[in-house]
């Protein structure tokens, strides 16, 4: 009896669960279709913005579209791309063009999905800029799918299309295409093959005053040289080319980072540190976490080479804590002047340092570790023998310690004297730093930075054209006009009185 009553209860309880699961699946499918519909409508709006920029000759509309590319690339599903391709290439020989080769499993004779067709989209042919933008979206989608063979062919076709056009309205889209063309070659480990092409496009962009194209191409060439550790060629490119001041913040940040790497490799650590800090400030503070991690690693190494110790709060940032772990241990080894720990850090994280392109600079830190250790010894002891110094530094012989101490005294690391006859090093009393020019120089550096920042901010502001002020009347003209209006009103009032 119990089993007979329990069976219908269990059946009744299980039925709503099935309904809920079916409803949730239907809701998910509906939400997916809605997202695809919104994505197609958004990219259509981008095409309208590009057409508007071409007609009005105002490039800021295209710039607005390109700024939303990181958001758009996450919405490039197969249905979205296929729907846009059906609209852009509805019939004729263009329907069998190169673009369809990069849309997988979407037959050329297929119809557009229901709800995604815009009747007004087939009335007029699209502009060349819209075609290049759609081709760029296909390339970005192939890169996200890691389909390098198709991405390589797509990139080559896109470059052929860009080079064959001589339209100034295409410059901003072409600049973005150059970046992704270089990215495809980098993923294929074939950057050297496109170097001459990038140089030729840089000459063309310079002659046409294409500032965004110049900035992108200079950065691509610098990345190309630095990928193969060609620092001399990169330095020559920087000296012989002019990076445009009107370039976007992202391109400026990239250029400053590459410039910092070049200067650090050429032992110009102060200049390198200045460029890298500016790159961090120009980079997006919320997005571009990978770029900030890369720059911050190099900043830490350069600061250590300058003899400074980075603040602990740098390593505590949530987005940087994990990636800066090896550099935190490196900083501790340098701060304590511990050669043994420095060697352990190199042994444990050497491969990661090589991937970060900081291993060569970190090798130079060994001298800084020794200098830090000698400075600590000089502060702790007023008199110490070379044998004790060799034992503390882990050196093989007292002669090596004596040589290192002599070099440190000559470089100004410590203020001491070395007495070989009596066999000890005597440290002099420390001087007051405020009696030197160092505080004045540091204050001057900060004031100069503030003034430069103010000047750059003023230059970046947009002002109305000078002709705008001519249309506005001055205060004196306004008073004269008001006086004339008052006189005219009085005359009209007197005439009315005369009529009565």
From Swiss-Prot:
Keywords: Proteasome
InterPro entries named among the record's database cross-references: 26S_Psome_reg_C (IPR013586), CSN3 (IPR050756), PCI_dom (IPR000717), WH_DNA-bd_sf (IPR036390)
Chain segments carrying region Disordered: 462-484
Disulfide-bonded cysteines: none
Protein's name in the database: Probable 26S proteasome non-ATPase regulatory subunit 3
Family named by the database record: Belongs to the proteasome subunit S3 family.
Species this chain originates from: Anopheles stephensi
Function: Acts as a regulatory subunit of the 26 proteasome which is involved in the ATP-dependent degradation of ubiquitinated proteins.
Pfam family, one: Rpn3_C
Any one annotated GO CC term: proteasome regulatory particle, lid subcomplex
Domain PCI: residue ranges: 253-432
Lyase is among the record's keywords: no
Record field: compositional bias (Basic and acidic residues): 468-484
GO MF, any single term: enzyme regulator activity
One Gene Ontology term from the biological process aspect of the record: regulation of protein catabolic process
Self-association state and partner proteins as the record states: The 26S proteasome is composed of a core protease, known as the 20S proteasome, capped at one or both ends by the 19S regulatory complex (RC). The RC is composed of at least 18 different subunits in two subcomplexes, the base and the lid, which form the portions proximal and distal to the 20S proteolytic core, respectively.
